[in-house]
């Protein structure tokens, strides 16, 4: 796919992140530009192609835009912003009195997502992703990798949608419309791989990380999880039972976090104890 050429002079810098920067069009603030740092050519194209497939699969996500390149050779994606949007993490931080409602709405979105059957020929199996991460990890012994691999293989298969990075900052709403965003890790498989991320972000992450990323103290994030868990799994299940089931899946995120941080992460790795013992 050939990139559409644009001039960065037409845009205003609005923010930055680990992979690049975001801009808004000077003449229309509803038009956003996600511009990757120099050298990243394939990543924005792959992200846009996947975003298009996810959108066409019926997942509630903003419609993807154009694959673009600037005069100096930086690649990115241009798309229309959702006006008046707010993430569920920001909503909880700004309005903790309505936390139960926000948690229930987010749980409803997740239940709908995890009930959506997808064409498995178009997306990656979540198990294959974790097998690959496991093989590449330098932080586990051969015996530990064998036990983790066995656990993954024994998880029941599902052909339903997986967000892949299910943080409650990656779900937004504007009025009565709700969307998932940042679906670069979208795949299919057992829903517990997704729910494990919700638990990790709210219960296993450090308070400082939660404050910086989700704009709230850890105590509030834990409250969100508890309301979410009841709405997602049903009030007839105890929180203890739910967390025992979800904990190993949160622990599997160790493979992603340690890859990104390039060091062991004991606070998250501890969640793998049910698998490794």
Residue ranges and their predicted role:
Residues 1-3, 264-277:
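Regulatory N- and C-terminal appendages and interdomain linkers associated
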Residues 1-4, 115-164, 168-169, 174-175:
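An alpha-helical support segment within catalytic cores of ATP-dependent transferases
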Residues 5-13:
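Conserved N-terminal boundary motif of the eukaryotic protein kinase catalytic domain
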Residues 12-14, 18-120:
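ATP-binding pocket architecture of kinase catalytic cores
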Residues 83, 166-168, 185, 197:
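Short, glycine/acidic-enriched loop or turn micro-motifs at the edges of active sites
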Residues 88-103, 107-111, 115-131, 135, ...:
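Inter-domain helical "communication" segments and dimerization helices
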Residues 171-195:
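Catalytic activation segment of kinase domains across protein kinase-like and atypical kinase folds
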Residues 195-236, 249-266:
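Active-site activation/catalytic loop segments of kinase-like enzymes and analogous catalytic loops
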């Amino acid at each position: 796919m050939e990139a559409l050429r644009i001039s960065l002079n037409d845009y205003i810098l609005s923010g930055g992140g680990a992979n690049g920067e975001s801009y808004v069009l000077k003449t229309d603030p509803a038009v956003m530009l996600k511009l990757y740092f120099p050298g990243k050519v394939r990543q924005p194209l792959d992200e846009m192609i996947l975003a298009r497939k996810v959108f066409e699969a019926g997942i509630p996500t903003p419609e993807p835009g154009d694959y673009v390149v600037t005069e100096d050779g930086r690649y990115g994606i241009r798309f229309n912003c959702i006006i008046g949007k707010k993430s569920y993490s920001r909503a909880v931080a700004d309005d903790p009195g309505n936390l139960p409602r926000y948690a229930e709405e987010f749980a409803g979105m997740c239940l709908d997502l995890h009930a959506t059957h997808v064409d498995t020929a178009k997306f990656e199996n979540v198990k294959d992703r974790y097998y690959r991460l496991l093989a590449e990890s330098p932080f586990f012994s051969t015996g530990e990798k064998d036990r983790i691999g066995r656990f993954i293989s024994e998880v029941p298969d599902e052909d339903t949608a997986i967000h892949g990075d299910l943080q409650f900052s990656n779900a937004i709403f504007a009025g009565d419309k709700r969307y998932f965003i940042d679906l670069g890790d979208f795949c299919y498989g057992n829903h517990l791989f997704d729910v494990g991320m919700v638990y990790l972000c709210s219960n296993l992450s450090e308070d400082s990380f939660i404050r910086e990323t989700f704009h709230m103290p850890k105590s509030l994030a834990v409250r969100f999880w508890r309301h979410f868990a009841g709405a997602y799994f049903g009030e007839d299940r105890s929180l203890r039972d739910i967390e025992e089931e979800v904990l190993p899946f949160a622990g599997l995120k160790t493979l992603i976090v340690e890859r990104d941080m390039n060091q062991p992460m004991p606070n998250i790795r501890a969640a793998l104890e049910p698998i490794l013992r």
